[in-house]
Structures are given as C-alpha cells and as structure tokens.
Amino acid sequence: MMTTPHTRAAIAALMAGVFTCVPGAWAQPAPAAAAAQALPASMPYVMPSTQVWDMASASGEMYRIFVSAPVGGEPPRGGYPVLYVLDGNAYFASFAQARWVQEYLPIGKSIVVGVGYPGDKAWDVRRMNDYTAQLRDPPPPETRAYAQHKSGARQEFLEFMTGKLRAEIALRYPVNPERQSLFGHSFGGLFALYALYERPQAFQSIIAASPSMEWNAQSILDDERAFSARMTAGKVGSTSRLLLIAGDRDTAGDPESVRLLADRLQRLSGWGLRARLLRYPNETHGSVPAQSVNDVLRFAFEQR
C-alpha cells in the first residue's frame, strides 16, 4: 500500500505519542508495590500490664527483667505472690499472657517475673554459666561439646535472684515475701533443683520442668545426697514444695530419671518435703513448657 505524505505524518505523530506515553506507564508502581504503599504503618506489639528493664548483678552481669503485674485494684492481703521464670526471653510471654487473661481470678492476682538477658534471642549462651555447676576437668564425654562455654556461676546467680533482684521487685510492687516461687526448664530446671538443695527456704514453691540431670555426669546427684542427709538429720526445717514435670517423649532417659528423682524425694515427706511428679503424654523436651503454663501457675499461686 502506498502512503501519502499526510499518512506518513499521521503515523509518525501516532508513534511519537505512543513512545511518549510508554515511559510514564513504566513508572507506575506494580500492583503489589502499590498495595504495600497503601498499608497502614505497623508497630511492635506490647503486651498489656508488663514492664521491662535491664539490671546488673553485683558482679556486673547484665540481665533483662520482664514483669507482668495487675494494674489498678487492691493487692491481696499480704501482697502479691510472685513467680520467677528462668529463660525469660523464651518463656515470659506465655506465663504473662496466661496470668493476664485470668486476672479476674485469684490465680491472676499475682506477679510473673521473667529473668533473661539483653537481646532478642530466645536463649542466651550465658544461661549455661548461670544455671550449672562448674564443668568437670576433663569434661564428661556427653558434655565435652560445652567445654568452650563458661559454666559454674550457679551460686552467684542464686545470690542475684534471692538478693538484689528480689529487693528490686519488692521496691516496685507490693509483694508477699512468703509466697515466692521459681520455675525453670531444662538447664533452668537443673538450677531449680540446685536452688532447692542449696537454699530450701528461699522459695516456697519450686517447679523443675525436664531438668537436665544428665549434665556433668549427673553431678546434681551429689547436691541431692547432701540435701537428703541434712533433711533426715533435721538440719533443714521448712522447705520448698517441689513440682517435677516431664514429657513422656522427652530426650532419652529424662522421664525415667525424673520419675526416680520424684520417688527418692517423696521419701523425705516425713521430714517436711512435699514433692510430686506431673507427666505429660506425647510431650517432648521442647514442648513441655508451653503445656505446663497453667499447671505451673496453679501450683505457684494456689492458696495453701
């Protein structure tokens, strides 16, 4: 087909218009990007009725303290009972949420204190130092991989828990000094047992969930034997109540070792120790804490 000068001019003008428009079209945001631009600004979630601060121990070790406490209203007579939760970065939120939604019940008229470490990790390697006895030299084969990390500060950590931290909580909140409880899981559960054996009057209730009793060739058994000897000799007096928790699908050997521990400690009931075992079918080492939350709160905060 032959084109005339007028036709060629019209086509040129049309093409110029097309290419003039294309860059503008390319500049338009993709549908997904446009949708993203339209989203409202987000913000971090802050759990109601909670406070967080960092504080140092006497030796300068830094800890992050998480607290869930009732807001408003009168505290119970004698003050609020307190549950200290080890590995607070990992477990505080679960316990705090359960306490908060039950605040209208007696179990919720209480304070949960999570003890953790600055940072956003669920677990900090420093827990191994704070919760354990000094690793033997040479280390047992099953704990040799841990030899690169510090261990053995459990006594100093217990002093921090029962001294400076407890005093700080009492300054900030009306607490009942006669209703103080401790929860720990895994290494934290091992520390909870140590707290019972070393300072049996420091906490009125202790919960040891899936305690890592195999640590350091079961050196915690030495502490248990010394504690039992003091108990049967009448040298302890009043002592904590103890709740042991294990999952039936916990790591190899754990459920059985915890059951045997419960049997041994229950024999001390004649000397004042009240110990019981709670087992969860189908729960593993990692799932026990979530399953245990309400059982722990009831054990810690029930009226006795």
Task: Specify the residue positions occupied by each region the protein language model found.
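Bacterial N-terminal signal peptides that target proteins for export
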Residues: 2-12
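N-terminal leader/targeting segments
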Residues: 3-4, 17, 29
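Bacterial N-terminal signal peptides
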Residues: 12-22
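Sec/Tat signal peptide C-region and signal peptidase I cleavage site
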Residues: 23-27
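Non-catalytic cap/lid and distal C-terminal segments of serine-dependent acyl enzymes
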Residues: 28-304
